[in-house]
Amino acid sequence: MNIYDILDKVFTMMYDGQDLTDYFLVQEVRGRSVYSIEMGKRTIAGVDGGVITTESLPARELEVDAIVFGDGTETDLRRRIEYLNFLLHRDTDVPITFSDEPSRTYYGRYEFATEGDEKGGFHKVTLNFYCQDPLKYGPEVTTDVTTASTPVKNTGLAVTNPTIRCVFSTSATEYEMQLLDGSTVVKFLKVKYGFNTGDTLVIDCHERSVTLNGQDIMPALLIQSDWIQLKPQVNTYLKATQPSTIVFTEKFL
């Protein structure tokens, strides 16, 4: 009999596309609660209170209490732990998801384990995962932007950096995406280049790259340009010189 045959509902964890509940039962996950802020502070002699000098979000650390299981024999348990080591060790951040947050993805990698008791083919362990990026990611959103002021709403709960994509319907000598406050241009991205009909321009505000038909044309981006960000839960008004598409990923803390 498989251990899952006696359980009504199983909490699942996916790591780099692999369902780890094939190897262990999750008891508890820590590191997903109200998030802390790291503050740099200083005081001035003779002055009441203090001064906050810096603020930042620390890396996220996920702790997973688990019970590794086999078929009831110590030999099978050892083999499963060997294979679990193979699955966990990664040299890049990978997607991590939990069944109680089906539309959220963390990105991190396994760091270390704290061993617990082992008895009767079961092994208790706490697995620690280090997420350089403290944010978790939701679905990807695609919105069209026209040559008139267009509202784009970031429905996430954190600032996100969009990717702009334009397939040129006519030839042009420049492309511009503007961020507006009423009729005022707050910031813009402008690319001066000889664009032909059918060319595909991609401006990635996260990677800070500009490509045309897959080729780098970063030098064509005007130095006065400023990368566009979408603030959470509000409309950002954008306007383009050619019909374009904005793609962004919702982010959460």
From Swiss-Prot:
Pfam families: Sipho_tail, SPP1_Dit
Top-level taxon of origin: Viruses
Gene3D superfamilies in the cross-refs: 2.40.30.200, 2.60.120.860
Gene Ontology BP annotations: symbiont genome ejection through host cell envelope, long flexible tail mechanism
Record's keyword terms, sorted: Viral genome ejection through host cell envelope, Viral long flexible tail ejection system, Viral penetration into host cytoplasm, Viral tail protein, Virion, Virus entry into host cell
Cellular compartments per GO CC: virus tail
Annotated compartments: Virion
Oligomer and partners: Homohexamer.
Function: Forms a 40 Angstroms wide channel at the distal tip of the tail. Remains associated to the tail after DNA ejection.
Protein name: Distal tail protein
